[in-house]
Amino acid sequence: MPNSSIRSELTTERGFSGPASNFNIGHGGLNQLGGAFVNGRPLPEVVRQRIVDLAHQGVRPCDISRQLRVSHGCVSKILGRYYETGSIRPGVIGGSKPKVATPKVVEKIGDYKRQNPTMFAWEIRDRLLTDGVCDNDTVPSVSSINRIIRTKVQQLFNLPMESCVKSLSPGQTLIPSSTVTPPESPHSDSLGSTYSISGLLGITQPSADGKRKLDDSDQESCRLSIDSQGSVGISRKQLRTEAYGHHPLDALECHFQRQHFPESYSSSTHSKTEQALYTLPLLNISLDDGKSSLTSTNTTIGRNLSTHQGYSALSEFTAFSIKQEASDSSSASSTPSSLCSPTFLDLQPINSGCSAPSFSAFSHPSVYGQFTSHVASGRDVVGATLPGYPPHIPSGQGNYASSAIAGMVAAGGDYSANAYSHGAYAAYGDSWRFPSSSLLGSPYYYSSGTRTAPPPTTAGAYDLM
């Protein structure tokens, strides 16, 4: 087959084969029946009419295809379209369609939409068919009507400003809202600027005579806080806009920069005596000096019970007395660490000439005992052990007398100073007890008589288990 051109035959309406013009291989060719075709071009009108005539004569589609040398798919498509629409013209399916959005149709769609803005596209399509504007072949589809409304009809509503101004009468004017400027009268500040929050919300502000003035103390505190926080004030001033006045912003900054929480501790409301207020820095200084006086001593705090260690309570601040008050929230399980908590302590000034009263470390001295001392410079609060804590036995000490434990608890009807013993527990040997001086082996939980040192742990002691 030559590459330049080919000789083909076209089927005429008589069914004979005649010479055809030269076709390019890239645009046309011969089908499987030997008939010529051109890519992208519809079948000639005479061939279409011949297919329909043969179909009316009762010829089968396969015979029509073989006789006219047209593919069976083309014959079926032409006949199906003819039975459906009654037309044999090409381009109805998959081809170029005639323009249905004519100016007359677009104008009618605009009239329908202006008369009833809520009308749907399918209602407009039915209205076009009812009024006879279009027929079944030229009526636009629903999607086409929506596109016409979106692109062409709505442009009539969104006219430019010049056309709107021209349509007005000579005595009427239309001013855009963007050109409105706030009034420059002296009363503009009291009525609120147009661009301010009060102006936008329509809130009328009171006049300058009716405003409440800040007192001198508030203004002075605001000046001090603004001077101390200059960098913050500068950054806030940079964020200001020219629409706001300086006086309302200064008043707002004054309230925000003021300290909201007091820096003093007051006594509890259920206190019976008058208590003075002491600021937080003074309390912190006294606590820091107390810590430094404790750490400055060269004596180490030992754990042996035979030695007495002194704890310096106050070294310089002799004008204060620590008074413990019993409250409802305090319990018998309070520890000496609660002395450092400002919740349970009240500081009370006393005269330098009188001696300080004795104080109890806990609200229930009958259970834990008490120790007293006069608070003075150079004196130490001396105690054998810290109240409320069981005596600690070093790891090297094997026995401990129960009389020391009895001394921790006041003698009474509920407590006995004798050693605790029970027949059920006395039958066990030393190998069944914990030999180490841990929490379970502490005499605080297991109080017995004079306990000797535990025997060395051997493997034979556990053979019975």
Curated annotation (Swiss-Prot):
Region (RED subdomain), start-end ranges: 104-152
InterPro entries associated with the record: Homeodomain-like_sf, PAIRED_DNA-bd_dom, Paired_dom, Pax2_C, PAX_fam, WH-like_DNA-bd_sf
Induction (free text): By retinoic acid in combination with activin.
PROSITE patterns: PAIRED_1 (PS00034), PAIRED_2 (PS51057)
Cellular component GO terms held in the UniProt record: nucleoplasm
Annotated region described as PAI subdomain, given as residue ranges: 29-85
DNA-binding region per UniProt: 26-152
Keyword Transcription in annotation: yes
UniProt keyword list: Developmental protein, DNA-binding, Nucleus, Paired box, Segmentation polarity protein, Transcription, Transcription regulation
Sample GO molecular function, one term: transcription cis-regulatory region binding
Region (Disordered): 206-227
Tissue expression profile of the protein: Expression starts at late gastrula stages in cells fated to become the primordia of the otic system and the pronephric kidney. Expression is maintained in these two structures through late tailbud stages. Does not appear to be expressed in the thyroid gland.
Superkingdom of this protein's organism: Eukaryota
Residues passing through the membrane, by range: none
Cell location: Nucleus
Gene Ontology annotations of biological process type: cellular response to retinoic acid; negative regulation of apoptotic process involved in metanephric nephron tubule development; negative regulation of mesenchymal cell apoptotic process involved in metanephros development; nervous system development; positive regulation of DNA-templated transcription; positive regulation of thyroid hormone generation; pronephric field specification; pronephric nephron tubule development
Function: Probable transcription factor. Involved in kidney development, acting synergistically with lhx1/lim-1 to establish the pronephric primordium in late gastrulae/early neurulae.
Protein name (database record): Paired box protein Pax-8
Gene behind the chain: pax8
